[in-house]
Structures are given as structure tokens and as C-alpha cells.
Amino acid sequence: MSQKHRILLLNGPNLNLLGKREPGIYGSKTLDEIVADLTHNADELGVTLEHLQSNAEHELVGRIHQAMGQVDFIIINPAAFTHTSVAIRDALLGVAIPFIEVHLSNVHAREPFRHHSYLSDVAKGVICGLGADGYQFALTAAVHQLRAA
């Protein structure tokens, strides 16, 4: 039997407040609920899902580094770090693990400073504006790409 593919889910700053923080923009589901649903679907798809949420850029960078040789795909919602973090971009490029960038809200329909991403041009894909479903779509796409490789 072949080894299960491993997918790393990373969530950036303030996503620990999902369900409480601006539900009109980010929805009413908590991050724990989103991760539980995603973990269940990952199990059904026959892949392993690991998760880290951090409000600290260096913790996300460190986990990306640890993923090298251990993880097959990354799904990342960098949150506010989308618009500021060259460090996360460089870490993702450095480990050369394919990734999909996810945003709950449509960042292009919001304030102008949210329109730029340091990650989008090096991501396999970007999903935004579809709420918590965006994570499910990213998981399905990641599994599809891993199986096609």
C-alpha cells in the first residue's frame, strides 16, 4: 500500500477569532469547525491533514521549513500576512512545496491595500470569496494535483 499524501493547512493572524470577528465578512463558522470538517474530508479522500494557526509570522515560516521533505502540499490562508510577508513567500519558494492560497472573503472587493498578495504569483492557485467552502475546494484541488503527478 502506498503512503498517504500529507497536506499542511496553515492559517495566519486573527483566524483564531473566526465566528466572532466580523461574521458578515468572514462567516459564522469557527476555525475549529472549519478544520474539523476539512480533516473529516481529508480522511475520506485518503490523505493526512496537519494544521497550524499562528498570529506570529516566524512560527508560520518555521513550520513551512519543517514541512520540507515531510509534506506534499500546503493550503495556506496567510490572512493579513498576504499583503506584507516576503518572509512567508521566501519560505514557500525555499521548500518548493506546491501550495494553494485561500481567503474567506473576496480580497479584491475590499480595501485597496488588500488587493496585493506576495504569494499569488507563486501559488498553484488562489481561492477567495467563497467562505469556508474555499478550504474544501483547495483540499479537493490539492488531492487532484497530487494524484495526477
Swiss-Prot record:
Catalysed reactions, semicolon-separated: 3-dehydroquinate = 3-dehydroshikimate + H2O
Catalytic machinery residues: Y26 (proton acceptor), H103 (proton donor)
EC class of the enzyme, as a word: lyase
Site feature (Transition state stabilizer) residues: R21
The keyword Protein biosynthesis belongs to this UniProt entry's keyword annotation: no
The EC number(s) this enzyme carries: 4.2.1.10
Domain of life: Bacteria
Record keywords, A-Z: Amino-acid biosynthesis, Aromatic amino acid biosynthesis, Lyase
Any one Gene Ontology BP term: aromatic amino acid family biosynthetic process
Pathway participation: Metabolic intermediate biosynthesis; chorismate biosynthesis; chorismate from D-erythrose 4-phosphate and phosphoenolpyruvate: step 3/7
Binding site for substrate: N77, H83, D90, L104, S105, R114
Keyword Cell division: no
GO molecular function, one term: 3-dehydroquinate dehydratase activity
Function: Catalyzes a trans-dehydration via an enolate intermediate.
Family according to the record: Belongs to the type-II 3-dehydroquinase family.
NCBIfam families: aroQ, PRK05395.1-1, PRK05395.1-2, PRK05395.1-3, PRK05395.1-4
Quaternary structure (record): Homododecamer.
Name this polypeptide is given: 3-dehydroquinate dehydratase
UniProt source species: Aeromonas hydrophila subsp. hydrophila (strain ATCC 7966 / DSM 30187 / BCRC 13018 / CCUG 14551 / JCM 1027 / KCTC 2358 / NCIMB 9240 / NCTC 8049)
Phylogenetic lineage: Bacteria, Pseudomonadati, Pseudomonadota, Gammaproteobacteria, Aeromonadales
